[in-house]
Amino acid sequence: MLFKWIDHPSFRKHEQMMAILYEMGMADKRQLQTVTGWSLRTIRWAIEKIRAKGATPEEKDEWVRSIPLPKRTSPREVAYALGRMGIRYVQDMMEEQQHAREAPEAQVKHFLGINDILIRVMEKVPREDLVWLSSAEATDLLLRTWERRREERDKRYFIRPDARLGIRDRRYWIEYDNDTEGARKLERKFHGYVHLNDSTPVVWVAPNEKRRDYLQTLWKNTVKAFYSNNQSVPEMHFFVAGKETPFLTKEETEAVLV
């Protein structure tokens, strides 16, 4: 529950920032500004306050890392992510024992792409009307669903959504595809959503039209090959990044619905 950490009465400002980075995985200054509503100066102060827990540059990175982003691929300067000590500190704050690893630098585009979906929605919808679950929280929700149904979880169909978005009374599973996953992994995720037997729409966001069309075709072929006997399948909506916002916020949409 990302937004509950903002101005949390039990945590200091820099601790709130640590909890927010823990939930987001990785984020740049612009994303942090939008999510928190804090000034850029406050964001910088909070980051430096966290890093000050370490004495050497290496120890500072154990608390929060600054990951440079190539200017040719992004106008952003750096992305921030918690290091090993930062993750452990937040888990103690939250009284969580679950395993969490550092966000891999190789997935920086993926994390920022997921966060951008939220940022675009926040530009249209008040924060108090939003619920945003991280991948870990969305996965935990699925686990609780399996347990509530008293069904044995089939590992073949177990999925880890990128996020779950709630806007007032509407809910969506969110998947950001950065054109890195192969057909086999995507098909496995498609099967996972079918076997959820859940009516929540799945929104796929791709970096370009070519990738969006590929995902759409792959989903069509999966349905035709495995679920053509009138078996219920979830709504799958496919968008180029940025085009999903009107659909999610119920404005005029350019969705490709299958």
Show the residue positions of the predicted features.
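Nuclease-adjacent, charged terminal/linker segments that flank catalytic cores
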Residues: 1-102
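Non-catalytic C-terminal interaction segments of nucleic acid-processing enzymes
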Residues: 9, 15-18, 29, 180, ...
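Short glycine/proline-enriched coil/turn segments at helix->beta-strand junctions
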Residues: 37, 167-170, 196-200
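Amphipathic coiled-coil/heptad-repeat helices and related helical stalk/stem segments
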Residues: 43, 114, 159, 186-189
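Active-site metal-binding core of divalent-cation-utilizing nuclease and nuclease-like domains
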Residues: 69-70, 107, 123, 128-172, ...
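Amphipathic alpha-helical dimerization/coiled-coil segments
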Residues: 88-135
